[in-house]
């Protein structure tokens, strides 16, 4: 991995999670560029080289190791890495979904972004259709995407879901199913190794996984901070 070519990291954004994924990618690019600048300055100082010429040498080495025959990008400037995997999502009029990975992801660590509570109109089929998707639609879109990523040869699959779907169905009362646990088992059977989510209120969901790791992050402070900008919380 270099700061211009993150060879093992890729992001697949489901239609519902694309806006969120794009925000994350902006921050990732900023982090990569900052780290590269620090590395470039340190190497230039250590080997007594001009920083611009060193940048050109680094780009040259990157081009030498690139598998593509057609090299793109500036010769003497930093090249921002591309994390987003080219993916085509198809929505059929009967409600079915299809996901097709359009580039090689074999051996990569893939993070799939999905926001099941995104109820805005989402452009699908290349922008030809704009549809409001339900939670069930988002979940099914996520499942077919996981399967496509797995069959494309990804080394590791992680899910980034700000809202864990069906988290309301985490306790059994009478003759009812545990859908939150069921989804966890489906994810594991599809090869998911990690799930990153926010503020799961139930320990039962976290304990329902046999193999996959679940990272339950807390966003209470960030939410209150943003709310305080538009609502007076002191009264």
Tell where the protein language model's regions lie, with residue ranges.
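PRPP-associated nucleotide enzymes
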Residues: 1-235
């Amino acid at each position: 991995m270099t700061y211009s070519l993150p060879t093992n990291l890729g992001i697949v954004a489901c239609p519902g999670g694309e806006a969120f994924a794009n925000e994350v990618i902006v921050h990732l690019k900023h982090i990569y560029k900052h780290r590269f600048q620090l590395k470039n300055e340190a190497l230039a100082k250590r080997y007594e080289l001009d920083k611009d010429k060193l940048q050109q040498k680094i780009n040259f080495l990157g081009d030498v190791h690139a598998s593509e025959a057609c090299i793109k990008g500036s010769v003497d400037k930093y090249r921002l890495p591309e994390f987003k995997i080219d993916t085509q999502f198809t929505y059929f009029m009967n409600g079915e979904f299809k996901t097709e990975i359009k580039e090689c992801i074999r051996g990569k660590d893939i993070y799939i972004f999905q926001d099941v509570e995104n109820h805005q109109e989402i452009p699908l089929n290349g922008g030809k259709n704009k549809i409001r998707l339900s939670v069930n639609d988002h979940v099914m879109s996520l499942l077919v995407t996981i399967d496509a990523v797995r069959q494309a040869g990804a080394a590791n699959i992680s899910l980034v879901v700000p809202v864990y779907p069906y988290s309301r169905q985490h306790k059994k009362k009478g003759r009812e199913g545990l859908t939150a646990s069921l989804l966890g088992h489906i994810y594991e059977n599809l090869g998911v190794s990690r799930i990153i989510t926010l503020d799961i209120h139930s320990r039962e969901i976290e304990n329902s996984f046999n193999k996959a790791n679940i990272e339950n992050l807390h966003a209470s402070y960030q939410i209150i901070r943003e709310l305080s900008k538009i609502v007076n919380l002191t009264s």
